[in-house]
Amino acid sequence: MNRRKFLSLTGGGIIVAATATVGTIASRTPALALAPWDQAGVIYDEPRKRALSYAILAPNPHNRQPWMVDLSTPDQVVLRVDRDRLLPHTDPFSRQITIGLGCFLEVMLIAAAENGYAVDLDVFPE
Protein backbone atom coordinates (compact mmCIF):
# COMPACT_ATOMS: atom_id res chain seq x y z
CA MET A 1 0.00 0.00 0.00
CA ASN A 2 1.45 3.33 -0.98
CA ARG A 3 1.41 6.42 1.15
CA ARG A 4 -1.32 8.24 -0.83
CA LYS A 5 -3.75 5.33 -0.57
CA PHE A 6 -3.03 4.92 3.15
CA LEU A 7 -3.71 8.62 3.84
CA SER A 8 -6.95 8.62 1.83
CA LEU A 9 -8.25 5.49 3.59
CA THR A 10 -7.29 6.81 7.02
CA GLY A 11 -8.79 10.26 6.33
CA GLY A 12 -11.99 8.72 4.96
CA GLY A 13 -12.31 6.49 8.02
CA ILE A 14 -11.91 9.45 10.35
CA ILE A 15 -14.58 11.42 8.47
CA VAL A 16 -17.00 8.49 8.56
CA ALA A 17 -16.41 7.96 12.29
CA ALA A 18 -16.85 11.66 13.07
CA THR A 19 -20.05 11.87 11.02
CA ALA A 20 -21.51 8.83 12.76
CA THR A 21 -20.66 10.27 16.18
CA VAL A 22 -22.21 13.66 15.41
CA GLY A 23 -25.29 11.97 13.95
CA THR A 24 -25.73 9.86 17.07
CA ILE A 25 -25.36 12.83 19.42
CA ALA A 26 -27.69 15.03 17.37
CA SER A 27 -30.44 12.42 17.20
CA ARG A 28 -30.62 11.60 20.91
CA THR A 29 -33.90 12.53 22.57
CA PRO A 30 -33.39 14.40 25.86
CA ALA A 31 -35.87 12.58 28.11
CA LEU A 32 -35.58 15.09 30.96
CA ALA A 33 -36.29 18.03 28.67
CA LEU A 34 -39.42 16.36 27.30
CA ALA A 35 -40.78 15.29 30.71
CA PRO A 36 -43.18 18.27 31.08
CA TRP A 37 -44.89 17.33 27.80
CA ASP A 38 -45.25 13.71 28.93
CA GLN A 39 -46.66 14.70 32.33
CA ALA A 40 -49.03 17.48 31.19
CA GLY A 41 -52.59 16.68 32.18
CA VAL A 42 -51.62 13.37 33.76
CA ILE A 43 -50.20 13.99 37.21
CA TYR A 44 -52.91 16.31 38.58
CA ASP A 45 -56.49 15.44 39.50
CA GLU A 46 -57.49 19.01 40.31
CA PRO A 47 -58.87 20.67 37.12
CA ARG A 48 -57.03 23.98 37.57
CA LYS A 49 -53.67 22.29 37.98
CA ARG A 50 -54.38 19.96 35.07
CA ALA A 51 -55.11 22.92 32.77
CA LEU A 52 -52.09 24.81 34.11
CA SER A 53 -49.83 21.82 33.47
CA TYR A 54 -50.53 22.42 29.78
CA ALA A 55 -50.44 26.22 30.03
CA ILE A 56 -46.88 26.31 31.35
CA LEU A 57 -45.81 24.76 28.03
CA ALA A 58 -47.14 27.76 26.09
CA PRO A 59 -44.80 29.63 23.75
CA ASN A 60 -43.27 32.64 25.44
CA PRO A 61 -40.68 35.31 24.63
CA HIS A 62 -37.10 34.14 24.94
CA ASN A 63 -38.38 31.19 27.02
CA ARG A 64 -38.61 33.51 30.02
CA GLN A 65 -41.89 31.98 31.28
CA PRO A 66 -42.93 35.34 32.78
CA TRP A 67 -45.97 34.12 34.68
CA MET A 68 -46.96 33.69 38.28
CA VAL A 69 -50.17 31.88 39.18
CA ASP A 70 -52.16 32.30 42.38
CA LEU A 71 -54.42 29.37 43.30
CA SER A 72 -55.31 30.53 46.83
CA THR A 73 -58.99 31.16 45.98
CA PRO A 74 -60.99 27.99 45.24
CA ASP A 75 -62.15 27.60 41.63
CA GLN A 76 -60.09 30.61 40.57
CA VAL A 77 -56.75 31.13 38.85
CA VAL A 78 -55.09 34.53 39.04
CA LEU A 79 -52.35 35.09 36.48
CA ARG A 80 -49.78 37.80 37.08
CA VAL A 81 -46.61 38.81 35.33
CA ASP A 82 -43.34 38.04 37.09
CA ARG A 83 -41.62 41.43 36.89
CA ASP A 84 -38.22 39.82 37.48
CA ARG A 85 -38.57 38.14 34.08
CA LEU A 86 -39.35 41.22 32.03
CA LEU A 87 -37.09 42.14 29.11
CA PRO A 88 -36.41 45.87 29.49
CA HIS A 89 -33.78 46.07 26.76
CA THR A 90 -35.40 43.98 24.02
CA ASP A 91 -39.05 44.54 24.98
CA PRO A 92 -39.30 47.95 26.70
CA PHE A 93 -43.10 48.17 26.28
CA SER A 94 -43.68 44.53 27.40
CA ARG A 95 -45.39 43.69 24.12
CA GLN A 96 -43.70 40.29 23.83
CA ILE A 97 -44.43 39.49 27.47
CA THR A 98 -48.11 40.35 26.96
CA ILE A 99 -48.26 38.06 23.93
CA GLY A 100 -46.63 35.28 25.96
CA LEU A 101 -49.21 35.68 28.74
CA GLY A 102 -51.96 35.59 26.12
CA CYS A 103 -50.55 32.31 24.81
CA PHE A 104 -50.55 30.97 28.37
CA LEU A 105 -54.22 31.90 28.79
CA GLU A 106 -55.24 30.42 25.45
CA VAL A 107 -53.50 27.11 26.13
CA MET A 108 -55.13 27.01 29.57
CA LEU A 109 -58.57 27.65 28.01
CA ILE A 110 -58.05 24.89 25.44
CA ALA A 111 -56.86 22.41 28.07
CA ALA A 112 -59.78 23.20 30.39
CA ALA A 113 -62.29 22.84 27.54
CA GLU A 114 -60.75 19.53 26.53
CA ASN A 115 -61.42 18.29 30.07
CA GLY A 116 -65.01 19.56 30.05
CA TYR A 117 -64.55 22.79 32.00
CA ALA A 118 -65.57 26.28 30.95
CA VAL A 119 -63.37 29.21 31.89
CA ASP A 120 -64.75 32.67 32.62
CA LEU A 121 -61.89 34.97 31.70
CA ASP A 122 -61.67 38.42 33.30
CA VAL A 123 -58.80 40.27 31.66
CA PHE A 124 -57.20 43.10 33.65
CA PRO A 125 -59.39 42.92 36.80
CA GLU A 126 -59.13 45.75 39.30
Language-model segments: which ranges?
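Acidic, surface-exposed loops and disordered segments
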Residues: 1-126
